[in-house]
Amino acid sequence: MHNQAPIQRRKSKRIYVGNVPIGDGAPIAVQSMTNTRTTDVAATVNQIKALERVGADIVRVSVPTMDAAEAFKLIKQQVNVPLVADIHFDYRIALKVAEYGVDCLRINPGNIGNEERIRMVVDCARDKNIPIRIGVNAGSLEKDLQEKYGEPTPQALLESAMRHVDHLDRLNFDQFKVSVKASDVFLAVESYRLLAKQIDQPLHLGITEAGGARSGAVKSAIGLGLLLSEGIGDTLRVSLAADPVEEIKVGFDILKSLRIRSRGINFIACPTCSRQEFDVIGTVNALEQRLEDIITPMDVSIIGCVVNGPGEALVSTLGVTGGNKKSGLYEDGVRKDRLDNNDMIDQLEARIRAKASMLDEARRIDVQQVEAK
C-alpha cells in the first residue's frame, strides 16, 4: 500500500544460476550457505531443504576436498534449488563438481592458483555453461596487493577484482558475477561503489563475517541497505554466525524494507507504551511464527492505540488499531470490523490467511488473463 521507493537499479548483464536469472533487472536473488559438513550428505540436504522452505533462491555449499566433491554429487541429486560450489585452493575440485552438475562456481582469485589453473576452470565452465563468481575478500587478498597497499583498502579490493575480470575477458568468458566483500561496512560499501563504476557484470553483495544474529544483521542491513538504495546489487547473502535460515529471513527483510522485493508479511508494529490496549509485542511475535508459511506480499500494521494506528492502517493491507476491549480492524485502508482484544492472535491470524488466499487468487486470475491475450 505504501508508495514504491524510487530506486533506479544499476544496469548489468544477465546471467543464470541454474534457472535463477541474475542481473539486468531480474529480482534480487537471496542466498545462503550451508554450515554442515558437506560429507554429511543427509544433514546438508536437510539444511538446503530448510533454506528452500523459507525462500532461498540459491544455496552455496563449501567443497573443500575431493570427498566433499563426491558428496556434492549426491546432494545435487536430492535438491531443487540451484547450488553454488565454494572452491578454495584446489582448482581440480572445481573441475570435478562441474562434472556433477553444479549451477555456479565460486572461486577466490587470491588462492585458487595461477592463470593456467584459472584458464582450465574457465574452459570447463564454458563447455558446461556454468557461470562463475569471482569472490574477492579483504581477508584473503593476493600477497602482492597486501604488500602494495599495506592493508585492505577499496582500491586493493577493486584491483584484485579487475585483475581477474580482465583475465576472464581475455579468455572471452562473460558468464560471471563479482563480489568484493569485507567485514568492515565502509570498506565493503566503497569497494562495491568503485567496482560498480568499472564493470557491468552482476554484483553479488555481502558483508563477510558480519557477526552473530543481531550484530551481523545490523551490519548487513546498513551495508547492503546503502548499496541497494543506490541501485547497486543483483544478488545478496547476509552472513551470520547463526542458523543459515536466519540469513534468508534477514535478506528478505532488508529487501522488504527498501520495497525492492517482497516475500511474505511485512509487519509494522509499535514499540508499545502505557497507551496500548492489547499485548502488541506478544501478538507480533506469535503471528511472525505462525505465519512463516505465508509468502504473499502483505503489509500488516499492529498498533496498540489510536495515536498512530489509524494512519498506519490506512496504508496497510490489514491493520489493527488498539481500542478499549475491542480493536479496530482495517482492510485496504477501510475500517471493517472490531476484534476482541482477548482473542487477538487467533482472530488476526484467520483474517490474514483469508486475505492472503484472496490476493493469491486475484493474482492467479490476472496471470491467466494476461496469458490469454
Curated annotation (Swiss-Prot):
Q: What is its EC number?
A: 1.17.7.3
Write out the residues that bind [4Fe-4S] cluster. Answer: 270, 273, 305, 312
Instruction: Alphabetically list the UniProt keywords.
Output: 4Fe-4S, Iron, Iron-sulfur, Isoprene biosynthesis, Metal-binding, Oxidoreductase
SUPFAM superfamilies (alphabetical): Dihydropteroate synthetase-like, Nitrite and sulphite reductase 4Fe-4S domain-like
Cofactor note text: Binds 1 [4Fe-4S] cluster.
Q: Which cofactor does it need?
A: [4Fe-4S] cluster
**Which GO-annotated molecular functions does the record name?**
4 iron, 4 sulfur cluster binding; 4-hydroxy-3-methylbut-2-en-1-yl diphosphate synthase activity (ferredoxin); 4-hydroxy-3-methylbut-2-enyl-diphosphate synthase activity (flavodoxin); iron ion binding
NCBIfam families cross-referenced by the UniProt entry? ispG_gcpE (TIGR00612), PRK00366.1 (NF001540)
| Physiological role | Converts 2C-methyl-D-erythritol 2,4-cyclodiphosphate (ME-2,4cPP) into 1-hydroxy-2-methyl-2-(E)-butenyl 4-diphosphate.
Its protein name is 4-hydroxy-3-methylbut-2-en-1-yl diphosphate synthase (flavodoxin)
Q: Which organism is it from?
A: Klebsiella pneumoniae subsp. pneumoniae (strain ATCC 700721 / MGH 78578)
